[in-house]
Amino acid sequence: LMRAIKILKPGIKLGDIGYEIQSHVEEKGFSVVRDFCGHGIGTNFHEQPNILHYGDKNTGMELKAGMTFTIEPMINAGKYDIKILNDGWTAVTKDKSLSAQFEHTLGITENGYEIFTESAKGYSKPPYL
């Protein structure tokens, strides 16, 4: 997540975000769930564009100052396949591997980005960063 955030600025493409996440995650032997994505934030909570957490560099919409969205990858220790349980909400890995999900809400500024969900006390930063 943080690697993808660090590249954010006007002019990069949405695919660059997914590529940054996917390449790092897969290099470490994990997988990125394909069934969920980040999303735009505006007058409605879930808006376009969809922010994929996998993909190819230099593809998709170009980021512009003023855009607001979430990046929220779900990373699996095994394969990326998931299923939704009968409660209609709970997502589990099909291969029963461990999984973790990370999320931030951000805005694109004239020169980069702002993390809206960052804690002033540092609670939003994992101790391993």
Description of each model-found segment:
Residues 1-129:
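Active-site neighborhoods and metal-handling regions in enzymes and metal-associated proteins
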